[in-house]
Amino acid sequence: QEVRDSLLSDPQIARVREEWTDLTVALVGIGSVEPSALLVSSGNTLPDRDLRALAEHGAVGDVCLNFFDAEGAHVESDLVGRTLGIDEATLKAIPRRIGVAGGARKHAAIRAALVGGWCDVLITDAHTAEELLRPQGT
């Protein structure tokens, strides 16, 4: 928290954060709470305790470290106090939010991101698009 607060007080970072409110388009990745084998092997993943806590709260995915459940509803996390990034309200105020993701491992996260309004345009692969068009439970 202390490091985060120090960074937030930096004029360069403050200026970047102010620019977020002027964005008209955002290109974002849609992440799954369960990290891929590649991310795990590279060490580029959240600590296990954070992943467990997110799973316990029903999180299935994230956009810009804003975690959400299967219905797309925001899932509170103490990561907010330890990370820097665009918050839900600022992100959702951007008129065009383009999500990029694909693969079977991310189907639940992608569906939730669309349902929750985290993105309004999706770039994905054909298999994922077909899966998303199927009624759930079939």
Describe each PLM feature range:
Residues Q1-T138:
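Conserved phosphate- and dinucleotide-binding cores of soluble alpha/beta proteins
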